[in-house]
């Protein structure tokens, strides 16, 4: 909700998992009606779809990130992409300042982090931004030489993208297969402010309690992890 323009923007997906588009609609509180911002914001080209998350910062900038999925199977998730808008979703830009030619597709998307399929890359996690408008993305995936997914942070410092590992987990698991799966960790949440990063998660290795990782310098990636509860929250996600 934009207080200045008194409007609400809603994103919706058309199509199905592995084959769909992302569209944006706007509701005017003054006129009491909906309008379409653009017919297609992210185009799956009838081959894939974007699983997305967004964050609106203090300046009103909309930060949007997503992974591509090639089929309905979660193991076909790949890559982390990024776009941002300064005008409530009408025009979109890369972190470099280059304006997107809409719709955004596989070929013209900005890639914050390149990851292949079968990386145990999770979809629909969380984002934040610092006072300078730099985006931060919380997620998890596994390295090619490991079968253990690790929590990660992906961020842009105003010039280039970086990523760091947050945890040192020991338990392997896979996202492969259909249906609802009982996986040992939750999708993470992230909060950024005053040069500090707070990363909220749940992990069976820590008794499935609510845990928070804290860092003050992502360049050296030293994290202090504290359990916020002394009891299990089962399959809770932040």
Model-derived segments and spans:
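Structural motif
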Residues: 18-26, 72-81, 145-152, 203-215
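Recurrent small/Gly-Pro-centered beta-turn motifs in extracellular repeat architectures
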Residues: 11-16, 65-70, 138-143, 200-203
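Hydrophobic strand positions within the blades of repeat-based beta-sheet folds
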Residues: 11, 24, 64, 82, ...
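Asp-box/BNR beta-propeller loop motif
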Residues: 27-36, 85-96, 154-163, 170, ...
């Amino acid at each position: 909700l934009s207080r200045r323009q008194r409007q609400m923007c809603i994103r919706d997906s058309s199509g199905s998992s592995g084959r769909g588009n992302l569209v944006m609609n706007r509701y005017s509180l003054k006129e009491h009606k909906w309008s379409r911002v653009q017919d297609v914001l992210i185009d799956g080209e009838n081959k894939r779809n974007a699983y997305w998350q967004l964050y609106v910062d203090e300046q009103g900038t909309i930060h949007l990130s997503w992974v591509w999925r090639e089929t309905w199977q979660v193991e076909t998730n790949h890559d982390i992409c990024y776009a941002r808008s300064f005008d409530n979703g009408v025009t979109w830009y890369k972190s470099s300042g280059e304006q997107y030619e809409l719709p955004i597709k596989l070929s013209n998307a900005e890639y914050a982090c390149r990851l292949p399929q079968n990386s145990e890359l999770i979809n629909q996690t969380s984002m934040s931004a610092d006072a300078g408008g730099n985006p931060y993305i919380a997620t998890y995936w596994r390295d090619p030489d490991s079968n253990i997914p690790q929590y990660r942070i992906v961020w842009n410092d105003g010039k280039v993208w970086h990523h760091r590992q947050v945890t040192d987990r020991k338990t392997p698991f896979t996202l492969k297969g259909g249906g609802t799966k009982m996986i040992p960790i939750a999708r993470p949440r992230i909060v950024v402010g005053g040069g500090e990063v707070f990363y909220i998660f749940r992990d069976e290795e820590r008794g499935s309690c609510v845990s928070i990782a804290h860092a003050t310098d992502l360049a050296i990636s030293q994290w202090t992890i504290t359990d916020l509860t002394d009891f299990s929250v089962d399959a809770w996600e932040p």
